[in-house]
Design a protein with these regions (language model features):
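Conserved S-adenosyl-L-methionine
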Residues: 301-327
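Conserved catalytic cores of phosphodiester-cleaving nucleases, focusing on short active-site segments
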Residues: 36, 66-72, 80-92, 108
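Structural motif
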Residues: 27-30, 176-191, 254-255, 273-278
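Domain-level recognition of nuclease-like catalytic cores that cleave nucleotide substrates
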Residues: 2-9, 120-159
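Charged, often low-complexity linker/regulatory segments
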Residues: 1-43, 153-174
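Nucleic-acid nuclease catalytic cores
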Residues: 93-138
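Long recognition/docking surfaces used for binding and targeting
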Residues: 195-292
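Active-site metal-binding core of divalent-cation-utilizing nuclease and nuclease-like domains
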Residues: 22-24, 48-80
């Protein structure tokens, strides 16, 4: 039997590591770590051979373990060759957490002389860069494979999203936590930006994207304000005119420039247009279900129930297309 025809079974309570292929315990933390390990390979372009999980980090006489480390190309998997360090936490862990927050990542970066970038992921996502004088500063993202610095994406850089649900969740959490808005209001602002993102992908005539922000812009207040006033607000004006039955004539983006900059940096490298419809549907259902329907006792039918029903019906009838969601 060829290797291509072998199906590896994963026992309950386990998850297969996308880097090593070995089984690991299925926990909320491990799920986040595996999502980001996969993202490093499929979206950022790093080879699996340069990535390692649970890497020992020596800090004085103590030793800690970094969740994920990307090493210099082809280098040994040792602390002295660390290029990027990632700390991946459960979706409910805040960056301000004293034990597992962003300070933990910064301490690992400070202890690793060759580490240039870091990424902390939990309830939100934050990237950091070590400057020439050794200071660790905020940056929009970590660089892609083969690049020295993060940059503003172009149209050809857009990739399909494999875990859109987590991206939407972090964005909504950030708007709700930092924008001074209630959950329903935060959802509506998120909806505006999703429409802006799709419109920019579909209607942009050049390789330049409006729904994008560069590292220098994100570091300055004037850059963030320029993003809002010169790119996103005009983009939303076009969206509003195209969808007058969704958005009112006097609506505009209500977010502060700093909050908007975070959302754009989270979504700018993904293609909502090219992402699989089921992935988009699952992400949207969770976003809507958490914010608009539960208080009225209304919920989306679970997707596994939908899939099961469709398969049962398909085995009974020969029609090419059927839907079980007519309520």
């Amino acid at each position: 039997m060829s290797e291509e025809n072998i199906v590896y079974l994963v026992p309950p309570g386990s998850i297969r590591c996308c880097i090593t292929g070995k089984l690991r315990k299925d926990t909320p933390e491990e799920n986040v770590r595996q999502r980001w390990a996969r993202s490093l390979v499929e979206e950022y372009g790093f080879p699996r051979s340069d990535i390692m999980l649970e890497v020992p980090i020596r800090m004085g006489i103590a030793k800690k373990r970094a969740d994920i480390v990307v090493f210099n190309p082809g280098a040994k998997h040792v602390q002295e060759e660390a290029l990027i360090i990632l700390e991946t936490k459960r979706d409910d862990v805040k960056a301000s957490d004293k034990t597992n927050g962003e300070d933990q990542l910064k301490s690992y970066m400070a202890a690793s002389s060759s580490c240039k970038y870091g990424l902390w992921v939990g309830q939100e996502r934050f990237a950091f860069e070590r400057s020439q004088d050794g200071k660790i500063e905020s940056v929009s993202d970590i660089p892609r494979a083969g690049e020295d610095r993060p940059r503003r994406p172009e149209r050809t850089d857009l990739k399909v999203a494999h875990d859109l649900t987590a991206i939407f969740r972090r964005c909504h959490n950030y708007i709700h936590g930092n924008g001074g808005l209630q959950k329903a209001e935060a959802f509506h602002e998120m909806l505006k930006l999703i429409f802006c993102k799709v419109y920019d992908e579909e209607e942009g005539g050049s390789d330049e994207l409006n729904f994008a922000i560069g590292p220098k812009e994100q570091r300055s207040e004037s850059g963030k304000r320029r993003l809002l006033e010169e790119r996103i607000q005009p983009l939303f004006t076009k969206v509003r005119k195209r969808y007058p039955y969704i958005f009112k004539d006097d609506e505009h983006i209500e977010l502060e420039p700093s909050v908007l900059a975070y959302i754009v940096s989270e979504m700018q490298f993904i293609s909502l247009v090219d992402t699989d419809t089921d992935v988009k549907g699952a992400a949207y259902e969770e976003l809507v279900g958490q914010n608009l329907r539960g208080d009225r006792g209304e919920y989306f039918t679970p997707r596994n129930v939908c899939d099961m029903t469709v398969r049962i019906i398909q085995s009974m009838f020969e029609e090419a297309e059927l839907t079980d969601l007519c309520s």
